[in-house]
């Protein structure tokens, strides 16, 4: 019990509340159907030769903060001026897409669907059309959601829009249980929209990703 109490003190001092007594750097990782104490290996693979051009071993169990870091390292390793990086939805993070854009790297990663409204069968954000000229959204009922204010959430600056016509709208049950349907837009969301357009115009991108980044692992296992 005394030894466990000492470990508890150490545990409370660690950022992610984890201590591995066997390997100090290892962390608990989520895997399909189970978990493992180990590492998360990041690889960047070129589409031409299916060679790993850059890799990194991390002890974070999610990939969301790795896209721009790996993309920049891959570009440097390949000595390339231009780079298109394709990743799965596990790498989608607004700040990472922005970082790639600012580094002149073209990123393609599907958005993660986290909308409660969509999950409940109501109108999703995609059903609200932005009018950039007027800085307002048009809802499925044809009403205008005008800009109301800006706010900071999780470090991101968001613009908030809503309409005053929601209470009497015939589509309200299909839209929101709240008094108004509010739409929030990140200040750099135009970059995400442009990326989605790239993905729509290149529907085979995810197939290319699977054939590329998974290829070396298949070779190693074989």
Roles of regions detected by a PLM:
Residues 1-222:
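Anion-binding and metal-coordination hotspots
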């Amino acid at each position: 019990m005394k030894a466990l109490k000492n470990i508890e003190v150490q545990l409370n001092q660690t950022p992610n509340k984890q201590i591995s007594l066997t390997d100090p750097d290892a962390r608990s990782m989520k895997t399909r159907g189970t978990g493992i104490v180990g590492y998360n290996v990041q690889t960047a693979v070129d589409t031409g030769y299916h060679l790993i051009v850059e890799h990194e071993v991390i002890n974070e169990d999610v990939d969301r903060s790795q896209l721009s870091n790996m993309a920049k390292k891959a570009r440097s390793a390949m000595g390339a001026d231009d780079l298109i990086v394709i990743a799965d939805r596990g790498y989608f993070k607004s700040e990472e897409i922005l970082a790639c854009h600012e580094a002149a790297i073209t990123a393609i990663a599907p958005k993660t669907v986290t909308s409660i409204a969509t999950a409940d069968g109501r109108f999703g954000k995609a059903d609200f059309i932005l009018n950039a000229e007027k800085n307002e959204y048009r809802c499925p009922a044809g009403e205008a959601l005008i800009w109301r204010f800006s706010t900071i959430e999780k470090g991101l600056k968001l613009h908030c829009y809503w309409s005053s016509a929601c209470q009497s709208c015939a589509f309200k049950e299909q839209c929101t249980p709240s008094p108004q349907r509010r739409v929030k837009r990140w200040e750099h969301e135009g970059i995400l929209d442009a990326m989605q357009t790239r993905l729509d115009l290149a529907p085979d991108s995810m197939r290319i990703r699977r054939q590329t980044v998974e290829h070396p692992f298949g070779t190693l296992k074989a």
